[in-house]
Amino acid sequence: MRYPKFFLLLFVSMILFSACKPSFEQKTSQAIQDVMNEFKAVGVSAAVVKDGKIVYNESFGYKNLNTQTTLTNDDVMRIASISKSFTATSLLQLVDKGVISLNDDVSDLIGFKIRNPHHPEIPITLKMVLSHTASIRDKEDYFTLDHLNPAVYGDCEESYFEYKPGEGYNYSNMGLNLAGTILEKVSGVRFDDYVRTNVIHKLGLYGGHNIDSLDANRFALIYTNKNGEYVESKGAYKSRSEDMPSYVFGYSSPIFSPTGGVKISAHDLAIYMMMHMNGGAYNGVRIISEESAKAMQTPVWKIQKEGEEQYGLCLREFIDFVNDEKYNVPGSYPIGHTGGAYGLNSIMIWSPADGWGIVAMTNGFTAVEGKSILKSLTNAIYEACIKE
């Protein structure tokens, strides 16, 4: 008769042990907060995908320091350069429809001559622009195409590097603003409206480029650390209403920042990420073809010198980023993109091999020498929530 009593005690012990053992949600939340403390972060929103679903979504800290309003999962942030992938995704829709080709000369698409004056005989293609191999140099003001327009700046020599288009890599915000303008010109729909209708809303998400079409109450304010104090970066959510009367269709698209202007929550960005993880479709809704999804994720440029990236079409491979050797060998690199502007840092990263994905964004932090807050957040979340 002792055996039933023994098993009862064993069962009770197991229940008590499991009750005391932190859940993966608790471990993940603690890991994120530890990173926040190290970087004195204003706020962090994060979402984790495993096995085709969001298994974790939490927000910490503040959306507004002045009012001490806490950050929630419904709040949106300007995600900076992850936005480039939204522009590329939209253009790949037109490629799928046969309207344009990645090998098209962008001069034919935009309506004026785009040529590197050092190599005027070489056409600059859409594929080059989306992979940062077009030899286009960022100017201080890349929110206008004037610096690429011969009618304004002649041969525009200062807007180009000396290497041949397609034979070098330099990250170019100007190039992606050109790509967004091409989307507008070719589709016949204003840039921000096209992306919102055909990508964001089609996936059932909330967000977009145009400040004036979104609820300002959901914006998580973005801060930069200046001399030890956090200062709001008001330019991050600047209204474009004053620019609209002079808006030139097919030319003024850069004011919406195709290169970095999407505002979205971590939760909804994770759903967008799952669409790319699933080869261009999510929940029965196809956004781009499997062929186009693969093209975006396949490096056009492979690292040849320090500072370069393994870059596809507005998506990149992460090398020596996740602290697990299995993801640091060719064929196993995670894919995604990062963003950084106005004090915000953001990341969207996933493993095609193992089906996990992480989204994290912070609306302000203090730099720590020799460390990256995005790498720290990614690895903290990976260790707590994903690694077995």
Question: Which residues make up each language-model segment?
Answer:
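Short, conserved catalytic-motif segment at the N-terminal edge
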Residues: 24-77, 150-159
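Bacterial N-terminal signal peptides that target proteins for export
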Residues: 1-7
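Short, surface-exposed loop or secondary-structure junction motifs
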Residues: 117-335
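C-terminal motif of bacterial Sec signal peptides marking the signal peptidase cleavage site
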Residues: 18-19
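Short, gly/Ser/Thr-rich active-site loops of penicillin-recognizing serine hydrolases
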Residues: 304-309, 320, 360-388
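Short, well-ordered beta-strand elements
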Residues: 337, 345-364
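Short active-site loop at a secondary-structure junction
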Residues: 37-45, 66-128, 161-174, 257-260, ...
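A generic structural motif
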Residues: 61-63, 237, 364
